[in-house]
């Protein structure tokens, strides 16, 4: 989300 690509958001959501 934001300046980060979709993969980062997906990873963060998964690890969070």
From Swiss-Prot:
Q: What is the catalytic activity of this protein?
A: (R)-prunasin + H2O = mandelonitrile + D-glucose
Q: EC?
A: 3.2.1.118
Cite the GO molecular-function annotations of the record.
prunasin beta-glucosidase activity
**PTM annotation:** Glycosylated.
What does the UniProt keyword field contain? Glycoprotein, Glycosidase, Hydrolase
* Keyword Repeat listed: no
Superkingdom as given in the UniProt entry: Eukaryota
Q: How does it assemble?
A: Homodimer.
Q: What is this protein called?
A: Prunasin beta-glucosidase 2A
């Amino acid at each position: 989300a934001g300046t980060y690509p979709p993969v980062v958001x997906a990873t963060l959501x998964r690890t969070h």
